[in-house]
Amino acid sequence: MATPNKKNKYDISFEVFPPKKDGEFEAAFEILNALATHDPAFISVTYGAGGSRSGKTVEIASYIQNKLQIDAVAHMTCVGSKKDDILAVCKALKEQNVCHILALRGDRPKDMSDEQFASREFAHANDLIDFLHQNTDFTIAGACYPEKHFESFSMESDLNNLKKKQDAGASFFISQLFFDNDFYYHFLEKAGKKGITVPICAGIMPITSAKQIGTTVSLSGSSVPKALADIIAAYSDNPEDMRKAGIDFCIRQIRDLQENGIKDIHIYTMNKPKMAAEIMANILR
């Protein structure tokens, strides 16, 4: 199967992040219980920088897979990892019946020297995908960038890298968040011409505060369309109206994708189940 669990006409999946502290697991489980009521195709779990919170990722992924009986996709970054580190995390995931990994390069740790960065065992995400494909039986996903990765020289270069990920063993992709669907539609067309044949889930992040948009754009490099900029300008001083308008924008964005034939949507929930519920009540399933 391409994506973990195809069961609805429109398959919606969620991203969550693990708790930062050991004492926060019960709250995290409650969030997951709420998200599970929406019958997602899968739930992905983010990974600490350099694997610093990989144990928490494994525990959350285990709860999703074993307690909730929903396919868990564990994020795995490799920029600061050795091959033995990767295999150890794979072993821990397998012991918890987790069979899906989203393979990412990850951000360079602040304490990583130039020498360490230059000599790292995994230079790019496709190296991790290839290693996992050759040494494990996980279903492997990769990331893609409708507006290109900020480090890429051009979209052509970025698409070449995406093809390398597919050739290395990625069976589906999850896109970086975007706010303008035209970028995604054009990206799909270009990816198809490049020979990308595996599914590409559309990554969608609801914007519910003016502060959030600045952080999100700086981290993702995503463009802000006029319609969203107008919402921020109109409601930045009114948090509740900003939240409502941001969720409405997200719903309209997803509905447009669905009406244009996009069946796989991945929602970056930011661990906010109430927000996710409002979105799920207003999109196609």
Regions found by a protein language model. Name each.
Residues 1-14, 19-24, 131, 229, ...:
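N-terminal amphipathic alpha-helix/helix-capping segment at the start of soluble metabolic enzymes
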Residues 2-3, 23-25, 51-63, 82-88, ...:
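Active-site-adjacent beta->alpha loops and helix N-cap segments on the catalytic face
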Residues 11-27, 72-84, 141-157, 234-248:
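Active-site mouth loops of central-metabolism enzymes
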Residues 15, 43, 93, 165, ...:
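Conserved, mostly hydrophobic/aromatic
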Residues 16-19, 46-50, 75-81, 106-107, ...:
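Active-site beta-loop-alpha junctions enriched in small/polar residues
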Residues 23, 119-145, 195-247, 252, ...:
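Active-site pocket-lining/capping segments in soluble small-molecule metabolic enzymes
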Residues 31-46:
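Catalytic domains of carbohydrate-active enzymes, especially glycoside hydrolases
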Residues 44, 102-103, 174, 266:
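Conserved beta-strand positions in the central sheet of alpha/beta enzyme cores
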